[in-house]
Amino acid sequence: GWRTTYGLTSILLSIGIIPLILWLLRKSFLGQQANSNGTYIVEKTSTSIMKSWTRGEMLNDWRFYLILPAVVAPSFIGTALFFHHLTLAEAKNWSAVWFTGSYWVYAVGSMTASLTFGPVIDRMTAIKSVPFFLMPKICALIIIWAFNDPLWAWAYLLLLGLNVGMTYTGLTSLWAELYGPKHLGAIRSLIVAITVLASALGPPVMGFMIDTDISMGNICIIFAIYCVMATIFIFVGLRSSKTSVKRHSGS
């Protein structure tokens, strides 16, 4: 039963995953010590080229407020959808067992995007590639609006997973490229707080829409329109980011 599943999972985390993480971190730390001289010079040189923005400076940057709607979209919409997935399945006449049993497709999508989007960012930079990260979510929402066949649940979950993988990989790189590495911890802590708040607001907002008799398909198309608008905003915000960052670093 579910108790056995939770128990086995906790045991696996205790005796398998946590020791593996500690071993990998120790190995990484030893590797950094072995190459401390060369690594330090490279990091110090690259940091000195680009001035790092403080959190306060970021909050005074107009680009941040154009990027923010796209940043909160995965947390707000994703949490809302997962919270109401049984309602979604009922609205689409999908078996709840079939739908929830297909979550592995979501995991495959998330893992695939996490592993592939990083190299894309390395080649293209986050400023050029991140504006596309909401495209899978837009397609997933359109699927819910347009199709009823249960097989479309796999495409929907796969696209949601792709969006999540691209989000976690891309946004961290984006903040480093836009605002530098020195104050990245302070900047990330603010972003995480905002996205957590968005996650908390998503389910009740979607629940209110359901209670006001807005169909699941129409809710998803509303979310899709929001994501399209957020994508336009982030394109505008990042279009001149290279020159803006250079101007700031030179001042």
Residue ranges and their predicted role:
Residues 1-29:
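Helix-loop-helix hairpin linking two adjacent transmembrane segments in secondary transporters
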Residues 1-11, 208-226:
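A membrane-interface helix-boundary motif in multi-pass transporters
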Residues 56-114:
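Extracytoplasmic gate region of multi-pass secondary transporters
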Residues 113-125, 210-211:
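Helix-to-loop junctions at the C-terminal end of transmembrane segments
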Residues 128-142:
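Structural signature of the two symmetry-related core transmembrane helices
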Residues 151-159:
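Paired small-residue
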Residues 166-179:
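Intracellular juxtamembrane helix-capping segments at the cytosolic ends
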Residues 181-213:
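A late C-terminal transmembrane helix in Major Facilitator Superfamily
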